[in-house]
Amino acid sequence: VLFRSNNCLILKTMKTHLIAIFCLVSISLMGQKTYAPAWESLDTRPVLSWFENAKFGIFIHWGLYSVPMWSPKGTYSEWYKYWLDRKTLLGNGDFTGTEVYDYHKKMYGEDFTYADFAPMFKAMSYDANEWADLFKRAGAKYIVLTTKHHEGFALWPSKEASKSYGRPWNSMEIGAHRDLVGEYVNALRKTDLKVGCYFSLREWDNPLYNRETMDLFYERHFFPQLKDLVNNYKPDLIWADGPDSMNDKIWQVERTLSWLYSESPVKDSIVVNDRWANNTGRNMGIIIPENIAIQIVHIISLGRSVVA
């Protein structure tokens, strides 16, 4: 375009610069989006496109329960400690309840406790790079690893784990003496696979884990431990599990998600599932199929439409 005077040229140049500045400011403000610790605000956060397009993921259960590696068909072997200590058993089948206890006593002796498996969990054959290569060749888009299951044993150097249980209770201090989560994350980051971290809410034998002391459990253990995991490994996905029969107020879910979405180092990229409390299924980006079934039964029991 030709201009008849310098004034026109200057005006056009200024307009271009103003547009550029406006775009930069807009982008900056988008990056500064924060979410208040309230569902009205948290619910406005969209599901990130990477997860909507990731149709195939791989879920890995791996921990101390991998040492005995046994439970009757139709039951969860990762619940070995619970079955052992409570002498009960739930699942698909007819059980007396003492199957795991009887097996454990026969294999390891009556005085051998679940904690005695910790020195045996050495992960000698673990090669995270081999895992990543296998997952990539399988066509997976994201992976989820159990960084901590319901017995509280952590696969990274979590000081909260050992402090709460009064003994070495993470893979750096006992057993493998390795940061298993760190190796997993580093291997996946060499590929385009998304990093998922399973994080258990419940901890069967944590001294603070009961309804009367949930505030202390949250402040002293749960929240600082979650922050440690997120700050150190910056996962793309947090898979929460095990809220038991406690709601979002007890678990302080709004506070947790507000931090994840607004302050954490992954605030613009993190995806979460729907198991942060017993009533958060319809507030999250991911709704797990078995949770949908529970919600449908609840809706029908109230005489409402399945389509809310």
Residue ranges and their predicted role:
Residues 1-2, 31:
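Short, small-residue-biased leader/transition segments that mark boundaries at the very start
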Residues 5-6, 273:
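Intrinsic-disorder/low-complexity regions
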Residues 12, 27-31:
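Sec/Tat signal peptide C-region and signal peptidase I cleavage site
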Residues 17-27:
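Sec-dependent N-terminal signal peptides
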